[in-house]
Amino acid sequence: MNVINRFTCSHGQLEKSILRLKSRRMSPIIDYIKESYHVNNAMEIKEKMYLYPNNHFALKLSALGIREKEEQCVAQVEKIIECALENECTVLIDAEEHAIQEHIDGITDHMMETYNGMNPCVYKTYQMYKKDAPEKLRYDLFKARNYSLGVKLVRGAYLKKDKSMGVLCTDEEMTHTQYNQAIADFAYQYKKKDKLLCATHNIRSIHVARHYMKLNKLYNVEFAQLMGMSDALSEYLQRSGYKVYKYLPYGSLYESVPYLTRRLYENMYMLKYI
C-alpha cells in the first residue's frame, strides 16, 4: 500500500473504504480533501451526504471561501447543515490556522445556536495547543444556552503557521495538560445533551477520558483517529465497547499530494505526541 492509499482514498475508493471501516465496527468521518476554495466544493459535500447518509462529515471553511467571500461561505454552510439534517448526518467544523480561526468560531457558534437544538448536529473544534483554548471551552460549557454543544478536542495541526502568532502553549507538556483538563472540564460541566469527541492518538489522553467516563457514568464521549494511524488503538477501543471514528480524507491524486505534504510538514513536531 502506498502512502497516498494508506492515509487517503480516491473518489472511486470512498464507498469501499466506508464499508471496510463499518465491517470493523468503526464509523467514518468523511472529509473532502480539497482545502482551497472552489465554487463546487459545497455541492461535492452535499452529494456525498445524499450518497452516504447517517455519517459524520468534516467541514473546512477555507474550502468554502471564508477568506474570499465570507457571506457566501456562511450561506453555503447553512445549506450543507440543512442537507446534513435531511440525511441524518453530523457536521464537524474543522479548526484552521489562527489568522482565520476567530471567523470560523463565530460562524460555528451561529450554526450551533441555529441548528443544534437538543441534539448536536454541528461540532466545534477546540485546538488545545492554544493558550486560550481552555477558557474558550469553559465559556461555551458554562454560558446560558438553549442548544446542545458538540465538542471536538484536538491538539492542533497548524504549528508552523500559528507559532509566529504567539498564541501557542509554551511547551509540549502544557498542551498535554490542557487537553486532559478539557476532558475533565467537559465531564463535570456538560449539559444533558452535549457530546464530546476526543480526536487523539495520545494514550494518556484516552486513559483520562476513559477514567471520567467510568467515574461520572458518561455515555456521550467518543473517540477518533486518522485513517492509517493508530489502527491497533482504534480497534482496541472498539473492542472495549467505545464508539470509534476514523477520519477518512478522500479526493483526487492531485488534491491528495498537497494535503499529505501539509499534514507531514505541519505535524513533524506534533506527531510524536498527538
Which positions does each model-derived feature cover?
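Positively charged, amphipathic and often flexible ligand-engagement surfaces
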Residues: 1-274
